[in-house]
Amino acid sequence: MGRKKKKQLKPWCWYCNRDFDDEKILIQHQKAKHFKCHICHKKLYTGPGLAIHCMQVHKETIDAVPNAIPGRTDIELEIYGMEGIPEKDMDERRRLLEQKTQESQKKKQQDDSDEYDDDDSAASTSFQPQPVQPQQGYIPPMAQPGLPPVPGAPGMPPGIPPLMPGVPPLMPGMPPVMPGMPPGMMPMGGMMPPGPGIPPLMPGMPPGMPPPVPRPGIPPMTQAQAVSAPGILNRPPAPTATVPAPQPPVTKPLFPSAGQMGTPVTSSSTASSNSESLSASSKALFPSTAQAQAAVQGPVGTDFKPLNSTPATTTEPPKPTFPAYTQSTASTTSTTNSTAAKPAASITSKPATLTTTSATSKLIHPDEDISLEERRAQLPKYQRNLPRPGQAPIGNPPVGPIGGMMPPQPGIPQQQGMRPPMPPHGQYGGHHQGMPGYLPGAMPPYGQGPPMVPPYQGGPPRPPMGMRPPVMSQGGRY
């Protein structure tokens, strides 16, 4: 085999030492940069061709190739692409390229070695921190278990020594509470054995469970329980000891139905008069209840807003939580009661005021905001029924119930004509007449007035007549 042919050089321009990927591109470059007439901008193929063109066409002589590096401006050299380049220049070019390649290889090797070194160093460093991390990880666990003994018994022994040398069980209970970790440490203190548990409870309970201990006022019980069993019992006793817990629901009905149900019953059971229960229910914080019982005295103070328990006087009517229902212009229509002062600020004649048997409160239904029951009373269904009783107060159902003279105990039979409109007011009157019996019926109406109202209205007055409206109302309503 013959000797290997010399490696072909990458296309490059002899005039400007510029490299190109393809010889065609090189030719285009030469024609545009080096062989272009500066007068007519005609692109020629070689240097001599450019000189001849300028001489013949423009009568000018060109001594050098334009845009060429110094020393390579010879216009007589006929170079076309890679052809025509002097051999010595070609050799020099090869030598330069070889040097460049060698240098690049060396750099690559150095870079590779550097990368390997970096990798090794990184690996070593990564391995080093890993062992360190576990150690650090172990340390925090030790401290954590020490602070909160609960997380793990195994952690306690290591953690306890730093906290306080001494009997592990006893000391851990004390430190958590003492350092001022009541929120987090309380349970842990509770977990501690009875011996340590008792001391921590006394200092710790105030921050952790202040209300239970003072309100029940039974610190000895908590101590005894703590002694009897681990501190775990201590925490439960506090919540259980909170006797007032049941009271809040009674005094503050958060929900209309439940609140009304609970408050009236409890109030009735208590020595407080039915009026108080009415006031409690009336203050149920919801429009449906508030509208009917806007101007009721509120000694119980079921409202979240401050209620003057004893002075339930003229100030009470404006107090109803919902202004829309309490739009009252003090009218002289005061119920016949010694407590006339309270209902003194009753709503205008428009709003129907239903006087209850309790004679301590006045139920008010403003005309502007018609409750669901009132609307239902105005429906044609009930208007049909009205003729039977002999009275057709359909036009003013709200007033009808008021005139309905609920005060007469049963009152319902007397107001047979009024009965249809009564549903809305009957509910409220019902509270006073039969607190236990009517409350359940009345409560649902607030939450779901339509279904409960008809049965309720019909039930008390006359079973036959009352039963029909419920069916009709339910069918029409739903």
Curated annotation (Swiss-Prot):
Bias (Acidic residues) ranges: 112-121
UniProt GO BP: attachment of spindle microtubules to kinetochore; cell division; microtubule bundle formation; microtubule polymerization; mitotic sister chromatid segregation; mitotic spindle assembly; mitotic spindle assembly checkpoint signaling; protein stabilization
Subunit structure: Interacts (via GLEBS region) with BUB3.
Domain of life: Eukaryota
Species for this entry: Homo sapiens (Human)
Record field: compositional bias (Polar residues): 127-136
A cellular-component GO term for this protein: nucleus
Pro residues biased stretches: 142-157, 447-467
Comment text on domains: The GLEBS region mediates interaction with BUB3.
Subcellular location, record wording: Nucleus; Chromosome, Centromere, Kinetochore; Cytoplasm, Cytoskeleton, Spindle
Annotated region described as Microtubule-binding region, given as residue ranges: 1-92
Source lineage: Eukaryota, Metazoa, Chordata, Craniata, Vertebrata
GO molecular function terms noted in the UniProt entry: DNA binding; heparin binding; microtubule binding; RNA binding; zinc ion binding
Stated name of the protein: BUB3-interacting and GLEBS motif-containing protein ZNF207
Tissue expression: Ubiquitous.
